[in-house]
Each structure stands twice: as C-alpha cells, then as structure tokens.
Amino acid sequence: MEPILAPNPNRFVIFPIQYHDIWNMYKKAEASFWTVEEVDISKDINDWNKLTPDEKYFIKHVLAFFAASDGIVNENLAERFCTEVQITEARCFYGFQMAIENIHSEMYSLLIDTYVKDSNEKNYLFNAIETMPCVKKKADWAQKWIHDSAGYGERLIAFAAVEGIFFSGSFASIFWLKKRGLMPGLTFSNELISRDEGLHCDFACLMFKHLLHPPSEETVRSIITDAVSIEQEFLTAALPVKLIGMNCEMMKTYIEFVADRLISELGFKKIYNVTNPFDFMENISLEGKTNFFEKRVGEYQKMGVMSQEDNHFSLDVDF
C-alpha cells in the first residue's frame, strides 16, 4: 500500500510536520484565500450590454460549465480523496481546496445571476449538466472518475486533467476578453480562479510524486489525451471560440500545450511538442509553476501567511 494512503493514527494532529513540501503547498493555498465580496462586478454590466449575441452566448455557456464543475471536483474530494489520503498535510490542503472551490462556484453563480436577467434562462444555465450536451459530456467524464474502481494514482491524474485541461481553454477565452479591455469583474475573478486552479493542479503533481507505485506512462498519456480531445471538441465544435473572435486551431494547439506542461510536471515526456500560440497567456498560472503566486495577482495574498522563513516555509521551493 502507498504510504500516503496507509492507515495513520496520527492523522488527527498536525504537528510534527512530516511532509514539508505538501505542507508548504497548503500554506500557499491559505495565503491566497479570497471571497466573492472582494470582486467588483458593478462595471461589467455596461460592457455586457455592448457585447454581440455570439459573445454573450459564449460567456454564458462557459460560466455555466464552470458553475457546475467546481461542485464535481468537491464531490470527488469529499467522497474519495479526503477519505483515502491519510497524511494530515494533504488533508489540510484538500479541506482548504473544498472551501476555495465553493467560492469559485459562488463567483460563477453570481456572475450568471448578474448578467442574465431572464429567470428561465438562469435556470437553464444553472442546470447545465442536464440542459447542455456539451457541458454534460465534460461533467460525465469527470463524474465517471469519481466512482471508478481505478487506484488513487489514476484518479489523481484524471482530476489533474479536469482542473488543468478542462478549465484551460475557458480560462484562456476569458483572458482574451481581458486583452480587449472588457468585463473587469469577470476577468479579475478569472485571474484569481485560474491562479487557484494552477495551484490545485500543481498539488496533484506533487501528490503523484509521492506515490511509490504510480500509474504507468501509458496510462497517464491515455487519460490526458482523452481529456484533451474532449476539451478541444468543447471549444472548437460545441462552443467554438470563434464566437468571441478567437482562432479555433490556435485554441486546439493551446490545449495541447497545456497538456504537455501537465505531463512534464508529472515527470513524463511531452505528447504534442507544441509552443504556446497565445502570447497573452505567457504569464498565466496554467502555464504551470506556482511562482505565479509570487506575482500576487491583484495583491491578493493574505499578509504574513507566507512570510515565515523558518519551519521550512519558503517561496523559493521549486517543485
């Protein structure tokens, strides 16, 4: 049995820290905590009213996917990962991740509630898993992995793919709107959320490195390429990014680029060997490393939480 999954009678007490790298990730998550009340969406309505019908359609569907997906991630954490993983440091991270995912879901729901005035359309968007086939396909894939009999390692990769690949193109599409100077509330919340998801993805890679018997490279590649094809279809066929003026082929390449970054972080060879086609995404968290945090997006980092130099807390650790 994997040491991180083995019964641990000390799991109820935090100190002494046994896994300093995992604890450091938890402290980074804690330092980046934010709430929806800190995001000003009051100026978005003016921009929203100026968008084309295609642009509105695209944004509404992306928000609908996001609003549902965080709940799926949380269900996996509650039902599987939090009960399987026995080391305290990881349980701290997963517990905090659940709180953050709730904030993401509330943020997306608030954005839908603000932009969409028709109550029937709101219900349609809030129930996207049932009402939108393109969202249902992604949700079904993620939910399948919650209940899968595969080992923790395989399911860890699947949810790294959900947070690293299934969100990547949608994040990029909203950053594209930021490049155009539109929707400051939406784009700022997107910065915060993509930063959080970048850390969650990095945490999955760190947990993977703690496995003594990880899944094979072939298994990992299979899960990741499956996620890539679903995400490419989502943003080039089901909900094409050309609706907001983005290039579909470049989006396909970008999703492959993100997948390569993920599989490299896991310690395997790249699959696609492509370069990032979106210059505006060069400094965004999904490119990988959590050094994105050190930029303090919008100065959102809790004061003092990461300032201790002792107890192995360091911002210089390179995973």
Curated annotation (Swiss-Prot):
The active site is at Y108. InterPro entries: Ferritin-like_SF, RNR-like, RNR_small, RNR_small_AS, RNR_small_fam. Its EC number is 1.17.4.1. Induction: Expressed early in the viral replicative cycle. PROSITE patterns: RIBORED_SMALL. Binds 2 iron ions per subunit. This is Ribonucleoside-diphosphate reductase small chain. It comes from Vaccinia virus (strain Ankara) (VACV).
